[in-house]
Amino acid sequence: MTIKLIVGLANPGAEYAQTRHNAGAWFVDALAERHGQSLKEESKFFGYTARLSLAGHDLRLLVPTTFMNLSGKAVSALAGFYRIAPDEILVAHDELDLPPGVAKLKLGGGNGGHNGLKDIQSKLGNNPNFHRLRIGIGHPGDKSKVVGFVLGKPLASEQPLIDDAIDEALRCTDLLMQDGMDKAMNRLNGFRASAR
């Protein structure tokens, strides 16, 4: 199994660019930049895309331009066009159940109430077996505050921790493409950024 598509979940527009809910897109933007690429809008895939060669593998990047709860439209359009199977897809997203400074890789599982993951699963024929990169953003402590929290910007103390976790996830993506998911998972899942 090789990852052929990495998706960064986000809401479109400048007003959302720095919000916690866009952490997945921060990762994909940084991955493109790390490899000297920039994402370009491709309307037939409802998003911004780029193509990389990583460890000898062809890899496509996607940041949907749909709203978060319609992310599956972009993912299924690109995956369908290039015949990419669900288990060859890695979706990077913000994760309330992990603190800032932590990021973890996993295959399948629930959607944790994340509307982007929900829509992707449903548009992939209700198949949850795609990989996820869960980027910790922390939790506001009260369910009723979640929407305001994910659509808010990280605190000044949290942003460097999230950035460090994304940096480690970038290094682990190189490892993933070279040595496989298990090695990348073992390394990333043990990482925790320390406060500066």
UniProtKB/Swiss-Prot annotation:
Species assigned in the record: Edwardsiella ictaluri (strain 93-146)
Gene of this entry: pth
Site (Stabilizes the basic form of H active site to accept a proton): D94
Family stated for the protein in its record: Belongs to the PTH family.
Gene Ontology molecular function, alphabetical: peptidyl-tRNA hydrolase activity; tRNA binding
Pfam families (UniProt xref): Pept_tRNA_hydro (PF01195)
Localization: Cytoplasm
Entry keyword ATP-binding: no
Catalytic residues (UniProt): H21 (proton acceptor)
Sequence positions that bind tRNA: Y16, F67, N69, N115
GO cellular component: cytoplasm
Name under which the protein is recorded: Peptidyl-tRNA hydrolase
Keyword Cytoplasm attributed: yes
The protein's assembly and partners: Monomer.
UniProt-listed Enzyme Commission number(s): 3.1.1.29
